[in-house]
């Protein structure tokens, strides 16, 4: 079944039988039994006892993957499955012009071309390891409703059609072998309304044969019903039990009031199952979907205005224009991505950096090169990132970050007077790092926060050095600044990283009045 544009249509006779999930009573009872075992209850008072794992606070850098059927049209963004059905959009017009009427070639018809025939999960994991990633979060299911894992709750999954393999499970196994912590993301909640545009005109969304894929296709203004909420919960439970992710990332829309009791049940179930596994886990959430302190807050394409007292996360992409593979990406520069990492870490956050693989299972050469370049920088400068904590102040300089979400629309040009700070305390001593965001034209870094006048350094400086093999030519400390004269830049995407080794703190001598 081939369309005029050359892509094969989905053969209805090739579909596996639909899965009956109309009665979830037994599955929900198993969830509630696991919650009853504790230690967490499904109420916010109990869930606020959660503590962010040390491994996550140390990790700092992870890889996000938006892979799926939407990479086949490779047009606009990962929301193509929605916007192609919204009349008046450029995606709708593009689809008509390229693939014909939506009733004859719908979103489902991209599935046969989503083959991932060149997929090499071990090579992917090795690339992520070279990039310096400590954890990986592949999309388990996006808004389109196509599961990238083997599922007993839907026939629309990668193990039964398209690639015909458990691509999520294969990547997580390869990540284990590369000592990368496994995670997964769920974007299922929005599927309640995601395909609703196709219900307003003659399209395959109206075909009852595909209701279990395109549905519910309800209005966004309406609250999800009990069946959708239970299915969301049990699909997520399936991911938890089958793959045991240590990071579980949720997209928006679970902050809708109807989700609240189900979110609490899910969190208690996940935390209790992790306790049974002997694993420390993380839930990432947006907006106000979770009570403060019960999980890890996530900002999309943004940053904080200052240091947050508890760990958080910034999820962003190598592309300014899309999260999935599309033709004609507007890529960020490597320097911009490293600055995002430094900025996030200086404010007590982790950076989750997204790439979008192609439908043949390969990663675009440009995206591979970006990851390799980040890894090369971290190989020489990672001491200022991994395992660090925020210093007294996060940043210095004239170019301040814009706080909030979706603030990466254009590259910000930093100066050599812009710094981000981190600190480390371990058995070898106390250290403070100043990450310069640009190289000084005159060769002198002037770090005002290290001047004697501000009194921000509690200890004397034992030594000053540069990470990454750079050379310190001279050091002068005045009331106004620490001035570090450095050699020529060695091709780093950003400026030098200054390392201060501080003298040990002076501990007051104890006077023993009883045995003096």
Language model feature labels by segment:
Residues 2-516:
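Mature catalytic domains of secreted/periplasmic carbohydrate-active enzymes
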């Amino acid at each position: 079944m081939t369309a005029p544009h050359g892509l094969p249509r989905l053969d209805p006779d090739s579909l596996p039988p639909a899965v009956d999930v109309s009665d979830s009573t037994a599955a929900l009872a198993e969830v509630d039994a696991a919650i009853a075992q504790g230690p967490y209850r499904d109420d916010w008072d109990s869930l606020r006892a959660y503590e962010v794992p040390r491994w996550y606070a140390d990790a700092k850098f992870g890889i996000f993957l938006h892979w799926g059927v939407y990479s086949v049209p490779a047009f606009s963004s990962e929301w193509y499955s929605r916007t192609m059905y919204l009349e008046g959009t450029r995606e709708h017009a593009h689809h008509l012009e390229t693939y014909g009427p939506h009733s004859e070639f719908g979103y489902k018809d991209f599935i046969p071309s989503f083959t991932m025939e060149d997929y090499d999960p071990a090579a992917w994991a090795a690339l992520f390891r070279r990039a310096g990633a400590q954890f990986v979060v592949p999309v388990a299911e996006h808004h389109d409703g196509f599961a990238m894992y083997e599922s007993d709750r839907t026939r629309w999954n990668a193990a039964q059609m398209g690639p015909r393999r458990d691509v999520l499970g294969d990547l997580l196994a390869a990540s284990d072998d590369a000592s990368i912590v496994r995670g997964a993301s769920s974007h299922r909640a929005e599927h309640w309304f995601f395909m609703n545009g196709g219900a307003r005109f003659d399209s395959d969304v109206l075909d009852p044969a595909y209701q279990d894929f395109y549905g519910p296709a309800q209005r966004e203004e309406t609250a999800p019903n009990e069946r959708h909420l239970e299915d969301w919960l049990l699909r997520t439970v399936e991911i938890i039990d089958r793959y045991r992710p240590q990071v579980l990332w949720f997209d928006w829309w679970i902050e809708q009031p109807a989700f609240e009791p189900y979110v609490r049940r899910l969190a208690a179930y996940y935390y209790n199952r992790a306790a049974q596994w002997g694993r420390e886990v993380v839930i990432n959430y947006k907006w106000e979907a979770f009570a403060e302190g019960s999980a890890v807050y996530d900002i999309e394409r943004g940053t904080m205005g200052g240091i947050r007292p508890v760990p958080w996360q910034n999820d962003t992409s190598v592309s300014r224009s899309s999260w999935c593979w599309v033709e004609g990406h507007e890529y960020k520069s490597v320097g911009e991505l490293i600055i995002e990492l430094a900025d996030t870490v200086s404010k007590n956050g982790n950076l989750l950096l997204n790439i979008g693989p192609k439908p043949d299972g390969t990663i675009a050469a440009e995206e591979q090169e970006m990851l390799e370049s980040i890894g090369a920088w971290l190989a020489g400068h990672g001491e200022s990132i991994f395992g660090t904590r925020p210093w007294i102040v996060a940043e210095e300089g004239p170019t301040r970050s814009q706080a909030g979400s979706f603030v990466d629309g254009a590259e910000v040009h930093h100066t050599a007077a812009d710094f981000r700070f981190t600190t480390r305390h371990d058995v070898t001593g106390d250290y403070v790092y100043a990450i310069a965001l640009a190289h000084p034209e005159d060769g002198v870094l002037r770090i005002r926060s290290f001047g004697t006048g501000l009194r921000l350094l509690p200890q004397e400086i034992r030594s000053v050095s540069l990470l990454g093999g750079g050379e310190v030519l001279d050091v002068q400390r005045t009331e106004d600044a620490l001035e570090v004269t450095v050699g020529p830049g060695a091709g780093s995407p950003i400026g030098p990283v200054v390392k201060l080794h501080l003298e040990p703190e002076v501990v007051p001598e104890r006077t023993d009045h009883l045995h003096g």
